[in-house]
Amino acid sequence: AIEQKKTEKVQIEKDKNLKETSLEKLKLKEQQLSAQLKEDERKKQELKRKVDVAIREEINKAKQREINRQKEKQRKKEEAKKGKSTQNTKTKNVKNDVAVNTKKVVTAESSEGSATGKNFANNKGRLPWPVNNGQITERYGRNSHPTLPGVSTVNNGIDITCSSGSKVRAVFEGEVSSVFSIPGSGKVVIIKHGGYMTVYSNLQEVYVSQGSKVSLKQSVGSLVNEGGVSSCHFEIHLISNGLPETLNPSLWLGGR
């Protein structure tokens, strides 16, 4: 009986040491996860900051273009009035030609942007995925952390985990508005589609440059390799009344 109690005591000590070791490993893992979470959050905030700056710059450019267009329109209007007062000997046909030409210029300038924005909006729920394969691993909005209880993160877009080095493609035709880098998080491409803008980040290589015209499903870059897999971060923004608004990409994407 004494020997049995000694054996039980030894076993209890082993179990106790094992539990303490497991607890230490668990604490260490939690610390590592917390550190990784902080780093991921830092990258998200840096991405958000740079995307906000890029979109704000695009909004300011659009405002300036509209101001310039209005100035040009006013200048032509004043020139037309001056021409009427100083050259009233012109024939009716010549006056009609001037009016027709002016009307054509105004129509060409005002129709392009609205047509592009309207087409993008009409494709809600039918846009192709930004990658050819993959699974959504973090959705738009607030997400609970998979291992840390009570911890959640906020996502301005969606994260799609896919094959290592996968190509990223434009979900709609448009023009490249910005290309920039995030330290430790690859490169970012922003494409404007009229009143909408799409964001593609975590890129290793970029195949387009600012001002480039892109077509539907055109490759814009390849993803960073993250231990045998890659993750594509994708966002959609709507510019309304000069203010940006994030949209849920899952509601816009359809088939691949």
Give the positions of each predicted feature.
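Long, low-complexity, acidic/serine-threonine-proline-glutamine-glycine-rich intrinsically disordered tracts
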Residues: 67-132, 138, 142
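Short glycine/threonine/proline-enriched tight-turn/helix- or strand-capping micro-motif at secondary-structure
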Residues: 105-124, 137-170, 193, 231, ...
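Alpha-helical oligomerization segments with coiled-coil/rod-like character
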Residues: 1-94
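Terminal peptide-recognition signature
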Residues: 26, 136, 160, 174, ...
